[in-house]
Amino acid sequence: MNADSIRQMIETGLPGARAEVRGDDGVHFEATVVCDAFAGKLPLARHRMVYATLGGKMGGEINALQLRTLTEQEAAA
């Protein structure tokens, strides 16, 4: 698994999302995801939305994913 594959999965699974994913070892990644669908949702709900885009890859091909989830307005602040 690589960072670009994860970015594509997130952006495909969350229409309108922009994702920046980093990770050099192939199993530990950091991602910043900006999506207006996060508006009004608590951080845990936002993270679950992102995890849902990754299917069964979490805990397998992706060992760890540190998330920062923002709306467009939060990202602009």
Question: Model-derived features: where do they sit?
Answer:
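Short active-site-proximal "capping" loops at secondary-structure junctions
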Residues: 26-28, 38, 72
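C-terminal structural segments of small proteins and small subunits
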Residues: 44-77
